[in-house]
A protein has these predicted regions:
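Metal-coordinating catalytic core of metallo-dependent amide/deamination hydrolases
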Residues: 1-115, 127, 133-135
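Active-site-adjacent C-terminal substructures of enzyme catalytic domains
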Residues: 18, 109-186
């Protein structure tokens, strides 16, 4: 995908950029991402952590089956994969810090996705992550605003009248001055 974007970019009418949404538990990807950042191949870098929701979905047969299907693994192999990834959770903070250093050195803007506490937002800000993408509650959005961070919410949230997850309503955040970017979505 990245190679195709780079190949086609000069021919495209729109200013096309590469936004990498990195799942923080994908620790094995760190060396490659660091190289891409160093090489100037990433234009925007986001930290995503969906591990808790992945683990919670294991107890929901429909969601679990959908995840297993997407991987192409057997149910047993999928369970082993999730367990192996979860046990490496203690490595995530250091990996995030190294990637933040690499992104800062490369001049790449960073986003944190689904910040769920003001403390989480402050921790990401301390690493140079100046964009809060879809903060999950008003307190966290307010922390982002008070810290001078950009705050992103999704336009589908506005159109639907609320978040598909049941979290923060973007229209409420906009009305309170707690949204600086409205994204069309991915």
């Amino acid at each position: 995908l990245l190679e195709n974007i780079e190949l086609l970019r000069p021919k495209l009418a729109a200013d096309t950029r590469f936004h990498l949404r990195h799942e923080t538990y994908n620790l094995d990807a760190e060396p490659e991402i660091t190289q891409w950042l160093s090489d100037g191949r990433i234009d925007l870098f986001a930290y995503n952590d969906h591990m808790d929701s992945t683990v919670a979905s294991l107890a929901k047969p429909l969601k679990r089956n959908r995840m297993v299907e997407r991987t192409g693994l057997t149910s047993e192999a999928f369970d082993q994969l999730v367990q192996r990834i979860v046990t490496r959770g203690h490595e995530v903070p250091a990996s995030n810090a190294r990637l933040a250093e690499a992104a800062c050195a490369a001049g790449v803007r960073m986003l944190s996705h689904d910040d769920n506490t003001p403390a989480m937002r402050r921790a990401f800000r301390a690493q140079g992550v100046g964009i809060s993408e879809f903060p999950v509650n008003e307190e966290t959005a307010r922390e982002a605003a008070e810290g001078g961070d950009f705050i992103v919410f999704g336009a589908p949230n506005v159109v639907r009248g609320g978040s598909h997850t049941g979290w923060t309503r973007a229209s409420d955040m906009i009305a309170k001055g707690l949204c600086s970017v409205l994204a069309s979505d991915y």
